[in-house]
């Protein structure tokens, strides 16, 4: 994988931590973070992520990840569109339209260049089966989008965005020079970039605004949804590491 110019790496370091909450009390996002943080920390110990950070991940494993993540993101965008169609609030619809554009930009900026460089073809993508655990994750989010209120749906999908920002940020801090010299450093650059962290912050703020004063029972349910998705994310890392030997 090609190494980007030095200024790209420095830019990613400057944006590190910008996705973090400002510590204001009483926000749903504070509670979500407390609920899922230990699961995200477990993710950082997954072999796939550790080997990507230190540069020892086998290329065929990264190739398989790129295919599965591409298939996942296509379904993720479809789920966002379902939420948009079900929402009656213009502000929420605008936010979702912006989020869809940002996710599509992630595909263009991160996925397509990597897949072209890896020689991944459309035929290869079409012939690849999604692992069962990843299918379960997609169906879980899709069910929430179809059946539950917008806040529950957005909370579920937020985990993926926030987890990537959190994991990339903390692993850059932990691995430092190893990531800088890793053939996979572009992945960490992408998910610590200003564009990505700004998009993630907007999502956190939207969830907080929708959860202005939920009762305790609903907050607990939202936390349960969020941490369930965090668990599915960890299953995802296991699936992409073991799925293509």
Residue ranges and their predicted role:
Residues 193-226:
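Long amphipathic all-alpha helical oligomerization modules
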Residues 12-16, 33-57, 76, 204-213:
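Short alpha-helical hairpin
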Residues 2, 9, 221-245:
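Acidic, carboxylate-rich catalytic segments that either coordinate divalent cations
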Residues 64-75, 98, 102, 221-228, ...:
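A non-catalytic, amphipathic alpha-helix used as a structural packing/dimerization or gating element
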Residues 37-42, 57-86, 155-165, 237:
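Alpha-helical bundle segments that constitute or directly flank the non-heme di-iron/ferroxidase center
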Residues 91-198, 227, 231:
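Active-site-proximal alpha-helical scaffolds that flank and shape metal-associated catalytic sites
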Residues 19-24, 28-35:
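N-terminal regions that are enriched for targeting/export leaders
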Residues 83-87, 145-148, 171-175, 210, ...:
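Secondary-structure edge/capping motif, primarily at the C-terminal ends of alpha-helices
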